[in-house]
Each structure stands twice: as C-alpha cells, then as structure tokens.
Amino acid sequence: MTETQSLELAKELISRPSVTPDDRDCQKLLAERLHKIGFAAEELHFGDTKNIWLRRGTKAPVVCFAGHTDVVPTGPVEKWDSPPFEPAERDGRLYGRGAADMKTSIACFVTACERFVAEHPDHQGSIALLITSDEEGDALDGTTKVVDVLKARDELIDYCIVGEPTAVDKLGDMIKNGRRGSLSGNLTVKGKQGHIAYPHLAINPVHTFAPALLELTQEVWDEGNEYFPPTSFQISNINGGTGATNVIPGELNVKFNFRFSTESTEAGLKQRVHAILDKHGVQYDLQWSCSGQPFLTQAGKLTDVARAAIAETCGIEAELSTTGGTSDGRFIKAIAKELIELGPSNATIHQINENVRLDDIPKLSAVYEGILARLLAGNAV
C-alpha cells in the first residue's frame, strides 16, 4: 500500500516527548486536523491530565476510537539505537517511543477518518475520538473522568475501538474482545519481634503465614469459561525482617494480585482470601485495590465487522482473545454497547527500540476505514 499520510502523522506524534501525563500538544494537533473535516472538539482537563472528546455528527450509532497520547519513560536513552523521540525508519520498521503504544494507532484512525469522510460526507451516525494523556500513569484523571462526563449527559457509544497494540505475529491476527479484572492485595502479617535463639518469646509471621500461603497458591479460584482463562493468583512481593540474621521479624508484608475472569467477583475473591487467612489463624491487616472489573464483548456485529475488515486488508482471520493486561477499555465499557481493542504488534511495547513494521501502518489505517465503512456507510460485512 502506498498511503503515507499515516506514517507522517505517526512520526509527528512520536517526535513529541509526551511522557505521562504530559500531552505536549498532541491532542491539539489531532483537533486541528480533524476540525478540517467537521469534528467538534471538547477539551476535558483534570489536574495535569489533558483529555479531548472529538465528535462528528449528532446521531446514532456512535463509532468511537479510544486512545492515549502519553507514553512511558524511555529508559536509558544511550541504549536506544536512535533517539527515542526522533522517529527513525530502518530495517522496514518505524522506531520511537510510542510507535506501538499507541501513537501509530491514533495516526491511523485519524487518516482513516479523513478518507472515509471524503468519500462519505453524509455518512450515517457519528464518529468520535476519546483521547487521554493519562493511560500509562495513574489513570485517575483520564478516560475514567471523561466517561463520567459523557455518562452524566447520557452520551453513549455504540461501537468502540481501543487502539491498543494487539497483534502477536502479524497485523490483524488478534482482537481483544474483553479483559480480565485486576484485584490487588497489600497484606501485613503481624508477629512479634525477638531474638532468633529464643523463638518461644517471639512470633514469627513468616512461619504463621506459610500454611496460608501454600493454600492460596494451590487454590482453584475458578475454571474460566469460553472467553476467559481461569482466574490467577500471583504474589509479586514478600518482605520481612531487619536484614540481620539473629532477629525474628515482627511483620511480614505480602503484595499479591488476582487477574480474574467473569466467573469470579471482586467480593467473592476477597471473602475467600479472608476465609483462608482466618482458617490458619493469621493475624493480619489487608488493604484491597481493584483497578478494573472484567468485561466482555460477545461475538457480534463489531467483532464481525472488524474481522471482515481485517480479512479484506490483511488476508487473515482474526482470533478473539481476552488475554493480557488491563486497558482503558475497562472504563469505557460502562458507556459502550460493544468494545474491542485492535492495533499493531505488541512485541516491543515499553521496550528499548520500540517499533512497528512500516508496511503495517497503511494496512492498519485501511482496517479502521473498513470498520467505519461497514458500520456507517452500509457496506456489507
């Protein structure tokens, strides 16, 4: 494919060092470009986070692209083969921080909109973009706040495409139609500090927690289902002791995380953890944090349309999957009837020398345009 506008826009976005939550006027660039084809822009800024809601049209159905202009830090710049914010083309790839996650996706959707509107100026429904500068950070003032605003005025989304990098081996091979929930625990096991030679005068929290730890790691939380793998329990950190070899620690800190399917609930997992700890007589404090509930878009119109657009452009059949981490889709699903994630390869995200294949860029834009055409121009699936 010879289309180069997507590449040029991606390079312009990558050249702006928008490390979370700094937007570096990326959203302003998008608004200026889309204003030319009839999009109205609404800036929704909260704290140091910039968000923008761009919309063309007032009627349903609403097809929305969601993405983020912020990127993660570069890591050691000297380890990059080229400066991370100076986009470079070499070896058939585009290099730069944000190339895969997710400035290329944003560029491709903008150019898809430009071509689609030029061909269908009186298209059905509405096209929207929800863009934030706080996805890679705390995600407290970004998409979730915009969703609150839209929900309050009953402005809902029929079909949402989140431009997260989803491809595994080749562009279009995977569509995310759901994500697992994420529930974290910060557990403090209480003991009594003492001299290691006098254990009868102390309570070792490592020892008291050990039986519960074994049970927690061996528990079958659920069996998963057609769309989700079984819920997983993983410990990320265990810390205890003073560093000395002759002191029994007074406390043990354990951090753990559930990635849970729709077969489990936040409340149910909490109850079962507390029951196991209580069963083993553990004295503890436990603080919980849930960063997202599981969500699922059943195979239907949006997945069918996306698969058809991928087949037409890429010549492959896309797999539906719910694997991987969380995304802003967990917030948008509250106002979106159907939601998928679809973008370039995820092989180098957050890494040194992050990149995308150059020949994937016009293809991704064509896939997005094909989705718009099938949803808003009556093109056959």
Curated annotation (Swiss-Prot):
EC number(s) on file: 3.5.1.18
Gene Ontology MF, one: succinyl-diaminopimelate desuccinylase activity
Active site: 70, 135 (proton acceptor)
Biological or metabolic pathway of the protein: Amino-acid biosynthesis; L-lysine biosynthesis via DAP pathway; LL-2,6-diaminopimelate from (S)-tetrahydrodipicolinate (succinylase route): step 3/3
One Pfam family hit: M20_dimer
Necessary cofactors: Zn(2+); Co(2+)
Family assignment from sequence similarity: Belongs to the peptidase M20A family. DapE subfamily.
Official protein name in the record: Succinyl-diaminopimelate desuccinylase
Organism lineage string: Bacteria, Pseudomonadati, Pseudomonadota, Betaproteobacteria, Neisseriales
